Amino acid sequence: MNVIEKLATYEDQISPGVSACVGCNVELTLRTCMKVLGPNTIFAVPPGCMGGVGVVGWDKESGAKTPVFFPLLDNVASMLAGIKMHYERIGRKVNVVAFAGDGASVDAGMQCLSGAAERGDKIIYICYDNEGYMNTGYQRSGSTTKGAWTSTTPVINGHGGKKQNKKDFPMIMAMHDVPYMATMSPAYIPDMVRKLEKAMAVDNGLAEPYISRL
C-alpha cells in the first residue's frame, strides 16, 4: 500500500463543507494534516485564513471533529505548551498541534514560538506560509517576498513593492536547535505525510513542519 492509499483509509477530521476560498490549497493542507495527526490531537488555530473557515466554529458549532482552540495571534505556542504540560501531568499522550499562518508565526507570534523552541516544549507547530495577511485584505507580512505588491506595499508612483527581504523562517527555527525542522508542500502529499509522521514521533522538543509558499 502506497502513501496515498494509506492516507485514504484515515478518517477525515474536518467536515466536507467549509468556507475557504475556492481552490484554496491551505484547506487541502489542513485536511491532510488533520487526517495524519488523527483524533488524538488538540489543535490551536489562531486568527487567520483557517481560523475563519469553520475550523474553529461559532455558536457551539465547528467543522472539526477534534478539539480546536482559538488563541490570540501572538500566544499560540505558549498556550499549547501549557496544554501539553497539563496532559503530561495527568499521564495522557496527546498530539498538541498549532496550525498557524505566517502572520501568527513569523511576525506576531515569533516571540512565544522562539521561547517554546528554546525551552524544548513538546508541541508540533505547523506554519502555513501564504506570504501575507490574506484574510484581512492581503497586507504584507515578514514572510512576503521582496518586491511583492500588497495592499500596504503598493507598486505605484515610484514605490516598488515590499522593500525588505523575506524572513528565512525555516532557518530561524533550525538555529534554535529544534529536534525536527522540515519544509513541505501540498504539491507533494506523500512527502508531507512522511514528514508529519516524523514530527509526531518527536518526544524531546518542538517539531516544526513548515509549509512553504502556498
Positions of predicted regions on the chain:
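Cofactor-binding active-site loop characterized by glycine-rich and histidine/acidic residues
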Residues: 2-125, 138, 143-149, 162, ...
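Glycine-rich ThDP/TPP pyrophosphate-binding loop and its adjacent helix/strand module
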Residues: 92-96, 107-123, 128, 132-214
